């Protein structure tokens, strides 16, 4: 099997890291060889696989020894549940420098040190928030990741983020092979959520690859720094992640997305009752003017 490189994007706080690690645990359980590369300065992309608070990052270790050239692969790569290989890029202190540079430096280091030559089936990049700036777009800009999955929900801001990320994919698809593999709905239990994300996926020219229901067992597993797959392999939520993993294994629908205009997106949100039609008659009016009317 040719190694598949996938990047997971989505709004900050949507559950990307949790979804990615549970998905990866399910792939490992299926016998797939997987590596996770955390592309977020928080360095929380591997904690459930490693049962750790946060893995030491490539950028932290490079600062300690002098430069990234002084590091060895075994210094930065840890093995976790199901023999999953884990690396965290890290970044500078908050307010200092560009964290995206850390992603670029880390991925280049892993490539040069042969981390990708280990007979891998999948590499997953867990990428910071909905930022598609130069550094964080690096996994797609440099043709590292060729498959993008966007984690979203039926909440308005999560859908805005999915649309913005799709715009970024279009930009880089013109010069490379990057494609959108689908939307993963990480449910927030909003009204008609699955229908809404299916409709959004249709607008974007893609698919909702799986609807992950909300279940408190995810939080119970997280408190123990474990994936649901490892914590309670017999529960229904573990089966949801297995289904997601199988759908990604079988996925052949990878597209250049067709992002919505803001008007189209707002029309969709109004159609599903997420957003009310704007009352244009009140725009620009002061309280005094409204009271006088």
Curated annotation (Swiss-Prot):
PROSITE patterns per the UniProt record, alphabetical: NIFH_FRXC_1, NIFH_FRXC_2, NIFH_FRXC_3
PANTHER family, sorted: LIGHT-INDEPENDENT PROTOCHLOROPHYLLIDE REDUCTASE IRON-SULFUR ATP-BINDING PROTEIN
Annotated GO biological process: nitrogen fixation
Residue positions, PTM ADP-ribosylarginine: 101
Originating species: Klebsiella pneumoniae (strain 342)
Function: The key enzymatic reactions in nitrogen fixation are catalyzed by the nitrogenase complex, which has 2 components: the iron protein and the molybdenum-iron protein.
Cofactor note: Binds 1 [4Fe-4S] cluster per dimer.
One Pfam family of this chain: Fer4_NifH
Keywords: 4Fe-4S, ADP-ribosylation, ATP-binding, Iron, Iron-sulfur, Metal-binding, Nitrogen fixation, Nucleotide-binding, Oxidoreductase
Binding annotation for [4Fe-4S] cluster: 98, 133
Entry EC no(s): 1.18.6.1
Oxidoreductase listed as a keyword: yes
Protein name: Nitrogenase iron protein
